[in-house]
Amino acid sequence: MEIKRFGNIEGKTMMLLHGNLMCWQQFEDLIPLLERKFCVYAVSFDGFDGTGETTYTTARDQADKLAAYIEKELDGQLDLLFAESLGCGPAVFLKASPTVQIDRMILSGPEYLDFGVLNRLILKVMPQKQYRTAHEKYMPAWALRFMGQTEQGMQTMLRRIPDHISLESVRATWAAGLYLYRTDFPVQPDAKVACWYGEKEGHMKKAIQRLRTAYPSLIVRCFPGFGHGELILHPALLVSELERFWLL
């Protein structure tokens, strides 16, 4: 795991958690717009830190490592946690941690991907396909349709894939996504949590229902015309929405 710090050391603290096959560089266009006001901590999970020496295991394991970092470096306090796609798993575990205090959290694209009896078959097939994507930097047309993504947006994401991603890490991220919503997260009635997603994303209705069981005050925001992960490709809009959420 790698955590990079940017911006105003005296500003509000913000941590960014990336999506699948990505690393901290998924936010490279966003960070310059945040640096003046915020102290930004951009994370690369195990298996996606470009070293080839780490392996992604579970969302809970990543959350535990982040909690230890926040305890040590930030006195256990974080003002805002922003998680994209894969990052939403560690985020919900981190929010439930008794050792850290997170004031606000945004889950971007936390799709419900549990397909029940098909999960085992998916775990046999999809990690291999996504591993190929990581190394060939190519996304087939069916995957673009599934994500609601444009070719141009996907090319931007493909350029940000780090080196040395293993099949073991990819398989672990798929398991994390398929089974995330089977976890019974503690109810946090006063938690300031938002769920953001693109209009073209699928599998969000069930996700929102499950998230509301943990966060009864959940704020839901749908972005018209966007697919999965596309909000990050519009950094100025994302920053304005972050600032608006901060004022709620």
Locate each region found by the language model.
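Gly/Ala-rich beta-loop-alpha elbow adjacent to hydrolase catalytic centers
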Residues: F82-A91
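Conserved alpha/beta-hydrolase catalytic His-Asp/Glu region
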Residues: V117-L118, T133-V187
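Catalytic histidine-centered segment of alpha/beta-hydrolase-like enzymes
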Residues: F223-L237
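Active-site loop/oxyanion-hole signature of alpha/beta-hydrolase fold enzymes
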Residues: Y41-L80, S240
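Short beta-strand/loop motif that positions the catalytic acidic residue
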Residues: Q188-P189, C195-Y197
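Acidic catalytic loop of the alpha/beta-hydrolase fold
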Residues: E199-M204, H228-G229
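Conserved HGGG/HGGXW glycine-rich cap/lid loop of the alpha/beta-hydrolase fold
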Residues: K4-G52
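Flexible "cap/lid" loop of the alpha/beta hydrolase fold
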Residues: A96, I102-T133
